[in-house]
UniProtKB/Swiss-Prot annotation:
Gene for this chain: SULT1A1
Family to which this protein belongs: Belongs to the sulfotransferase 1 family.
Entry comment describing in which tissues the protein is expressed: Liver, lung, adrenal, brain, platelets and skin.
This protein's name: Sulfotransferase 1A1
Residues bound to substrate: K106, T107, H108
GO biological-process terms attached to the record: 3'-phosphoadenosine 5'-phosphosulfate metabolic process; amine metabolic process; dopamine catabolic process; estrogen metabolic process; ethanol catabolic process; flavonoid metabolic process; sulfation; thyroid hormone metabolic process
Molecular function GO terms recorded: 3'-phosphoadenosine 5'-phosphosulfate binding; aryl sulfotransferase activity; flavonol 3-sulfotransferase activity; steroid sulfotransferase activity; sulfotransferase activity
Annotated positions binding 3'-phosphoadenylyl sulfate: 48-53, 130, 138, 193, 227-232, 255-259
Catalysed reaction equations from the record: a phenol + 3'-phosphoadenylyl sulfate = an aryl sulfate + adenosine 3',5'-bisphosphate + H(+); 17beta-estradiol + 3'-phosphoadenylyl sulfate = 17beta-estradiol 3-sulfate + adenosine 3',5'-bisphosphate + H(+); 4-ethylphenol + 3'-phosphoadenylyl sulfate = 4-ethylphenyl sulfate + adenosine 3',5'-bisphosphate + H(+); 4-nitrophenol + 3'-phosphoadenylyl sulfate = 4-nitrophenyl sulfate + adenosine 3',5'-bisphosphate
Domain of life: Eukaryota
Species for this entry: Homo sapiens
Alphabetical list of Gene3D superfamilies matching this protein: P-loop containing nucleotide triphosphate hydrolases (3.40.50.300)
Length: 295
């Protein structure tokens, strides 16, 4: 019981104005000593935007499409989560020590909190953005099952918090826009979750080109097949069922829940949708990013 008392529902902590899970905020100090390498590859997303999906795609690419090699460890061990920290589990920095080059790394950090070494080394970044409505709904369910977050409250109150950036990692609007801006000056492949759902093979080809690798077409098809939502949901190396229940309670909501575009329509009321759209138009004014909220 000690572990549960220690981990359950701590309030968010603000770092440079960004709200973070308490343990992740504590990890930022040690993270400053992190040294990036030019052959590192960073996977960056706002939470609930397809991070695990693109991580598995990239690990399969790095392993030449060998599924057995991708079963060597859970995804969070194969692709260290830089700012991860929780009692009784190896931190992202600790996992990193045992990761051979070339390394795949994962973060949800906004640019203000990103270790400068990643930018100095011009580390390539694969960024995935997902439409805000589906992110908000998915995040609400994730808050329920991942007990390192505060209580999510009602859907209506959570949506309000999401709109003003008072959820872990702060504003979705700022996150997607600042990484989009960075793509003009830094090697960033900016992908959209909805494009990946619509045509995964096309998007995987983009990733291959970006990382300077090639695979035979039948291997690419194999990667598409084994990184489908259906396959990843039942794969213990990708579905987070190996994480202790004190941290993630899959009986509340599975980590891999629906993995679709447009599911927000089952949750948003008409009034919530109208309010969200008006606020969205204001926050995204002048931004050239365009999202599809359904397929």
């Amino acid at each position: 019981m000690e572990l549960i008392q220690d981990t359950s529902r701590p309030p968010l902590e603000y770092v440079k104005g960004v709200p973070l899970i308490k343990y992740f905020a504590e990890a930022l100090g040690p993270l400053q000593s992190f040294q990036a390498r030019p052959d590192d590859l960073l996977i960056s997303t706002y939470p609930k935007s397809g991070t695990t999906w693109v991580s598995q795609i990239l690990d399969m690419i790095y392993q030449g499409g060998d599924l057995e090699k991708c079963h060597r460890a859970p995804i969070f061990m194969r692709v260290p989560f830089l700012e991860f920290k929780a009692p009784g589990i190896p931190s992202g920095m600790e996992t990193l020590k045992d990761t051979p080059a070339p390394r795949l790394l994962k973060t949800h950090l906004p640019l203000a909190l990103l270790p400068q070494t990643l930018l100095d080394q011009k580390v390539k970044v694969v960024y995935v953005a997902r439409n805000a409505k589906d992110v908000a709904v998915s995040y609400y369910h994730f808050y329920h099952m991942a007990k390192v977050h505060p209580e999510p409250g009602t859907w209506d109150s959570f949506l309000e918090k999401f709109m003003v950036g008072e959820v872990s990692y702060g504003s979705w609007y700022q996150h997607v826009q600042e990484w989009w801006e960075l793509s003009r000056t830094h090697p960033v492949l900016y992908l959209f979750y909805e494009d990946m759902k619509e045509n995964p093979k096309r998007e995987i080809q983009k990733i291959l080109e970006f990382v300077g690798r090639s695979l035979p077409e039948e291997t690419v098809d194999f990667v598409v097949q084994h990184t489908s939502f259906k396959e990843m949901k039942k794969n213990p190396m990708t579905n987070y069922t190996t994480v202790p229940q004190e941290f993630m309670d899959h009986s509340i909501s599975p980590f891999m829940r629906k993995g679709m575009a447009g599911d927000w329509k089952t949750t948003f009321t008409v009034a919530q949708n109208e309010r969200f759209d008006a606020d969205y138009a204001e926050k995204m004014a002048g931004c050239s990013l365009s999202f599809r909220s359904e397929l």
